[in-house]
Amino acid sequence: MNNIRKNHPLMKIMNNSFIDLPAPSNISSWWNFGSLLGACLALQIITGLFLAMHYTADTTTAFSSVAHICRDVNYGWIIRYLHANGASMFFLCLFIHIGRGLYYGSFTLTETWNIGIILLFTVMATAFMGYVLPWGQMSFWGATVITNLLSAIPYIGTNLVEWIWGGFSVDKATLTRFFAFHFILPFIIAALVLVHLLFLHETGSNNPLGISSDSDKIPFHPYYTIKDLLGLLLLILLTLILVLFSPDLLGDPDNYTPANPLNTPPHIKPEWYFLFAYAILRSIPNKLGGVLALIFSILILAIIPILHTAKQRSMLFRPLSQCLFWTLTADLLILTWIGGQPVEHPFITIGQVASILYFTLILILMPMVSLIENKMLKW
């Protein structure tokens, strides 16, 4: 058995990635989220496959088919709610995973970090298209508002929007293509995950100290397989509590009304995991400016390795940078709250201040404070 594990071409890859992989001896529970994201992706693909067996991508029957899944299909309700709340868990793990990368300086592994950013964009695109599929009011108007943002692109904007719609409004053609993309993208994500891991295993994992751990490595199995299993059990527990006790907690009641192009909901808002970006978009009165701010709010992650001015990789021993990191976390929570509020006083002002603070913290304050810390440590 030992020989098969180490010599068989396929088993050898598995062995070197998950069993005999040399891992730092001191990585904390914050390093669990990579495997949890893998578990979330597997859950989404499996539940999504079963939903696709009963779903019809047609404007006249899409809403009814989702109701049919919940009412008539055996355990359809639990599959549907696992899929919907699984997306929330996916993004929760994703945000923590990125936050850990920022805090401990994992972004210095630039290839892994950049593939991660591409993964983030792909997951966001997949989630957006998935939200359109039940064809409720918020699905329809969310699709209309977000796709319409592309019309802000000079010269080609309008043509681009109509090309994506497949007509002059969000209609049957849009729903069909969104379903096709929503089905294929998770498999592209899975392929990108393998590339993400490939680059990670070229350098090895970072650790809380941010120093080389070559001198002290332990095998991934059994130490981190057991540790990851604990995280997985807690994630399953949290997901099941959400699915079985309050499955609609994170959803929008408007999505239980079938899509009606003649009736606009009073407050159009996306799912909670997009609210921070939506708040940044809304905080700029100009359409093109808002779209650019929206894109840059996520693309800013790509320039973080360039903005890293500290001599230490991790924030573990940098209290001033820690203060700014947690200020950024609080700022993102404020933006998330603002994104779900109506566009009126005082929410407009709070959103604008929070948006300015978001960019100021990342682009100016964090690099400056890192330089100050270097001076204080006489480095």
From Swiss-Prot:
InterPro entries: Cyt_b/b6_C, Cyt_b/b6_C_sf, Cyt_b/b6_N, Cytb/b6-like_sf, Cytochrome_b, Cytochrome_b_C_euk/bac, Cytochrome_b_N_euk/bac, Di-haem_cyt_TM. One of its GO terms (molecular function) is ubiquinol-cytochrome-c reductase activity. One of its GO terms (biological process) is mitochondrial electron transport, ubiquinol to cytochrome c. It is a multi-pass membrane protein. Disulfide bonds: none annotated. Its cofactor is heme b. Keywords: Electron transport, Heme, Iron, Membrane, Metal-binding, Mitochondrion, Mitochondrion inner membrane, Respiratory chain, Transmembrane, Transmembrane helix, Transport, Ubiquinone. Heme b b562 binds at residues 83, 182. Heme b b566 binds at residues 97, 196. Its main location: mitochondrion. A ubiquinone binds at residue 201. PROSITE patterns: CYTB_CTER (PS51003), CYTB_NTER (PS51002). It is found in: Mitochondrion inner membrane. Belongs to the cytochrome b family. Component of the ubiquinol-cytochrome c reductase complex (complex III or cytochrome b-c1 complex) that is part of the mitochondrial respiratory chain. The b-c1 complex mediates electron transfer from ubiquinol to cytochrome c. Contributes to the generation of a proton gradient across the mitochondrial membrane that is then used for ATP synthesis. The cytochrome bc1 complex contains 11 subunits: 3 respiratory subunits (MT-CYB, CYC1 and UQCRFS1), 2 core proteins (UQCRC1 and UQCRC2) and 6 low-molecular weight proteins (UQCRH/QCR6, UQCRB/QCR7, UQCRQ/QCR8, UQCR10/QCR9, UQCR11/QCR10 and a cleavage product of UQCRFS1). This cytochrome bc1 complex then forms a dimer. Heme 1 (or BL or b562) is low-potential and absorbs at about 562 nm, and heme 2 (or BH or b566) is high-potential and absorbs at about 566 nm. This is Cytochrome b. It comes from Eulemur coronatus. The gene is MT-CYB.
